[in-house]
Amino acid sequence: MTELERRANEMRSDIVRMIAEAGSGHPGGSLSCADILAALYFGGVLDHDPERPDWDERDRFILAKGHAAPALYAVLAQAGYFPREELLTLRKLGTRLQGHPDSNLVPGVEVSTGSLGQGLSVAAGAAAGLKLDGKPQTVFALLGDGECQEGQVWEAAMFAAHRNLDNLVACLLYTSPSPRDLSTS
């Protein structure tokens, strides 16, 4: 087992424990993110610093599918943004680890997300801003396959192409065929 596989499996374990302790959540959407998050955060792809979450030179990661927040919390805790013990406070009253990520509460969360289809637009705007400022950072967005049916996602993709945003990386999780793909009629 490679180090990245070990980290992804550790995240999956944390995700299952968090959701079981909370008694609610989105296990499938969260578990499906582990490999990508391990590669980004621990594979030398995403330039970040848990000691300085607001470091100006950091790359940005936007979890467009905000309902998969347990996966983001698991990778952030593993990376050292906050103590892993805090993971078991998911969805409890008064905790900062809610069902959708909140950038005002959780270090390492770039954008509060939850409404499907908006993450890529935010990421494209951030990438455009960095590019206009002449900064070399990259913006990564993780989208679910279901939200790609939102028109806003395609508008953001067209904007990114038109603006030549080569500092924007969209990762798409294709987890299963839609019922329409399975139709026999």
Where are these regions (language model features)?
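Flexible, compositionally biased loop and terminal segments
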Residues: M1, R6-N9, C33
